[in-house]
Amino acid sequence: MSLQFNSIALLLVSLILLGVLGNNSSITISATILLLMQQTFLAKYIPFTEKYGVNIGIIILTIGVLSPIVSGKVQLPNWTALIHWKMFLAMAVGVLVAWFGGRGVNLMGTQPSLLTGLLVGTILGVAFLGGVPVGPLIAAGILSLFIGKTG
């Protein structure tokens, strides 16, 4: 087995370092797994990951979000709570963020080169502004509002 030193490997190593420096384990783990895949016999699975990775990730994320409801740690509100203005606002924000995410998936599909900038921006926001890595999909969706074309 010989290691491949190319621009993609360099990008992945850079993302790993930024993830470590920015205390962003999601970026660190993801870039490490992809680097290991690229450098080993697992490279044959990269097309599968490319094709289905976002959908699988969204499924896992949805399971994580719904788990506290299923476990009983988060109680469902009664019907009267659903008509409170804060609940309406929460639902509206949820719809807006889901829409941003959809636009983000489209933008990343049509302009994948922007993903690096989105990741670096997310890492910088976590490292220096006390932010939380909520995800490149939402960032890409917001970016699509500024640059247009989503596919």
UniProtKB/Swiss-Prot annotation:
<dbReference type="GO" id="GO:0005886">
    <property type="term" value="C:plasma membrane"/>
</dbReference>
<keyword id="KW-0472">Membrane</keyword>
<keyword id="KW-1133">Transmembrane helix</keyword>
<protein>
    <recommendedName>
        <fullName>UPF0756 membrane protein HS_0993</fullName>
    </recommendedName>
</protein>
<feature type="transmembrane region" description="Helical">
    <location>
        <begin position="123"/>
        <end position="143"/>
    </location>
</feature>
<feature type="transmembrane region" description="Helical">
    <location>
        <begin position="1"/>
        <end position="21"/>
    </location>
</feature>
<feature type="transmembrane region" description="Helical">
    <location>
        <begin position="52"/>
        <end position="72"/>
    </location>
</feature>
<dbReference type="Pfam" id="PF04284">
    <property type="entry name" value="DUF441"/>
</dbReference>
<comment type="similarity">
    <text>Belongs to the UPF0756 family.</text>
</comment>
<dbReference type="InterPro" id="IPR007382">
    <property type="entry name" value="UPF0756_TM"/>
</dbReference>
<keyword id="KW-0812">Transmembrane</keyword>
<keyword id="KW-1003">Cell membrane</keyword>
<feature type="transmembrane region" description="Helical">
    <location>
        <begin position="81"/>
        <end position="101"/>
    </location>
</feature>
